[in-house]
């Protein structure tokens, strides 16, 4: 007979405890000097709006790193085309010079040595063509190593940013509890996408994902491999930004819904107060 009131008291105590904990909690991913107190209610519009702003800020930073990766891939493609043109030109010069040298040497008995001048010019042209090819290959190796360092820095930065976002999402899902299931599912989907990207960087990075092998370091195959890896990493990060965009849209709709309901409640209270003045 006395169990029902006891359960009610426990439920009220649980709500008060959760509300009190929410008042004192902060977003852990903001860092020192940037922590902000959360709203009084776990599902209030102010708390959702604050979390949405934080999420959009972190999403923008992550998207900026994706743009940097895409720019690196474009630079590698332009470098590959220039190297291809230089190699074709160098090979053509080498072939032309070698042909001229052979013709000059073969005609030297007939021309009494005059064609040796043509042979010398041909050798010079062949040497110049070889120099162009070697210079192009060295430039390709140097640019590959430079772009590789940039990609490694971007990957490390993205990994740190995704860990911050994951801490925010874990905090949000924990305090969302059994509230809006659709919003909670969007948060979990975003967490899964971020976890997959972090594992993608850590797992493949430890096995040479971003570092070409020494056997491939001086070949043109390594550039194509590096470009493919960069594109794969960018696609993985874009899946994270897509999941964060979906969560942000859900947050925006919930904020608007909460705002409308709170306005309607305030209007109803004001109408009741005005009606009470006449009685």
UniProtKB/Swiss-Prot annotation:
Q: Tell me the compartments it is located in.
A: Cell membrane; Cell junction; Cytoplasmic vesicle, Secretory vesicle
Instruction: Name a GO CC annotation attached to this entry.
Output: cell-cell junction
Gene it is expressed from:
APOLD1
Picking any one GO molecular function of the record gives:
lipid binding
Top-level division of the source organism's lineage:
Eukaryota
Recorded family membership: Belongs to the apolipoprotein L family.
Q: What does this protein do?
A: Is a modulator of endothelial barrier permeability, required for proper organization of endothelial cell-cell junctions and cytoskeleton. It also plays a role in the modulation of secretory autophagy. May affect blood-brain barrier permeability.
Q: What is its main location?
A: membrane
> Could you provide one GO biological process annotation from this protein's UniProt record?
autophagosome-dependent secretion
Record's protein name: Apolipoprotein L domain-containing protein 1
- Tell me yes or no: is Membrane among this UniProt entry's keywords: yes
Instruction: Name the coiled-coil region(s).
Output: 226-253
Tissues showing expression: Expressed in neonatal dermal microvascular endothelial cells.
* Keyword set, alphabetical order: Cell junction, Cell membrane, Coiled coil, Cytoplasmic vesicle, Disease variant, Membrane, Transmembrane, Transmembrane helix
Q: Which residues cross the membrane?
A: 83-105, 122-142, 192-212
Record organism: Homo sapiens
Query: What induces or represses expression of this protein, per its UniProt record?
Result: In neonatal dermal microvascular endothelial cells, by hypoxia.
Which disease appears in this protein's record?
Bleeding disorder, vascular-type: An autosomal dominant disorder characterized by increased bleeding tendency, without platelet dysfunction. Affected individuals experience spontaneous episodic bleeding, usually beginning in childhood. Clinical manifestations include epistaxis, oral cavity bleeding, menorrhagia, and excessive bleeding during surgery or childbirth.
Bilayer disposition of the protein: Multi-pass membrane protein
């Amino acid at each position: 007979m006395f169990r029902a009131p006891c359960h009610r008291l426990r439920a009220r105590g649980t709500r008060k405890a959760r509300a009190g904990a929410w008042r004192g909690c902060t977003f852990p991913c903001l860092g020192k000097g940037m922590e902000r107190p959360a709203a009084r209610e776990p599902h209030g519009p102010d708390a959702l709006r604050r979390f949405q702003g934080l999420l959009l800020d972190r999403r923008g930073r992550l998207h900026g790193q994706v743009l940097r990766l895409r720019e690196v891939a474009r630079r590698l493609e332009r470098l590959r085309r220039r190297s291809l043109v230089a190699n074709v030109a160098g090979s053509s010069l080498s072939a032309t010079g070698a042909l001229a040298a052979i013709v000059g040497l073969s005609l030297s008995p007939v021309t009494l040595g005059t064609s040796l001048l043509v042979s010398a010019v041909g050798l010079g042209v062949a040497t110049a063509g070889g120099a162009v090819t070697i210079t192009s290959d060295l430039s390709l190796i140097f640019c590959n190593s430079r772009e590789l360092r940039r990609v490694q820095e971007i990957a490390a930065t993205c990994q740190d940013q995704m860990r911050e976002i994951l801490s925010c999402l874990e905090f949000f899902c924990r305090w969302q509890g059994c509230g809006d299931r659709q919003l909670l599912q969007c948060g979990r989907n975003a967490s899964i996408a971020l976890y997959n990207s972090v594992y993608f960087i850590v797992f493949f990075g430890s096995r040479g994902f971003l570092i070409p092998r020494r056997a491939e370091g001086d070949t043109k195959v390594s550039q194509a491999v590096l470009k493919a890896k960069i594109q794969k990493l960018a696609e993985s990060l874009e899946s994270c930004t897509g999941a964060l965009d979906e969560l942000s849209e859900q947050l925006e709709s919930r904020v608007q819904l909460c705002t409308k309901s709170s306005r309607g409640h305030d209007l109803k209270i004001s109408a009741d107060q005005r009606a009470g003045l006449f009685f």
